Amino acid sequence: MYSEITKCRISKSTNLVTVLSLGDQYLTGVFPKSVDEEVTKGPVDLVWCPDSGLLQMKQSYSLDEMYGDNYGYRSGLNASMVRHLEQKIRTLERLVKLNDNDLVIDIGSNDATSLKAYSGNHRKVGIDPTGLKFKEFYTDNITLIPDFFTAEKFENNFPSDKAKLITSI
């Protein structure tokens, strides 16, 4: 199911202007196992808050339903996706000087394809609520946190560390 905001997510202002309404839509990341299985659908509206300038979704859907066990993507199966992610990591390595033991994090790491593309000896962490089903594709030098990313979860796992680089696609 879903909930709807009545205040801006940043400023808490109630001044919200509807910019786009797509009507009822099915959750696109849900893949039913049979034609009889119900898939949640609901409104998709973008609202803008002139007070903060934030364009935001009016609705929030259940994360567990959107990103449950039937969700996930194996980037490693698609050669063009692997090349794209490797190029992305090469670009980031040129922009950010990474040293050995620097902490790099990929939020929504799927099958760890991005993390495997790093060329250095870094501490690599994948955070993904569906990661367990792809665990076999994680090499021994990649830590998987099979959960949704929150600052609190990160701090619980790395209380005295700061990530040098964080990615999410």
Q: What residue spans do the PLM features occupy?
A:
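Short loop/turn motifs at secondary-structure junctions
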Residues: K12-N15, D100, G120, K162
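A conserved beta-strand element that flanks and buttresses the S-adenosyl-L-methionine
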Residues: K164-T167
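Conserved class I S-adenosyl-L-methionine
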Residues: N99-N110
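Class I SAM-dependent methyltransferase SAM/SAH-binding core
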Residues: D111-K153
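Acidic active-site catalytic centers that drive phospho-/nucleotidyl reactions
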Residues: S21, D106, D128
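N-terminal juxtadomain amphipathic helix
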Residues: M1-A79
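Conserved alpha-helix/loop element of class I SAM-dependent methyltransferases that forms part
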Residues: R83-N101
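Short amphipathic alpha-helix with an adjacent loop that forms part of the alpha/beta core around
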Residues: E152-D161
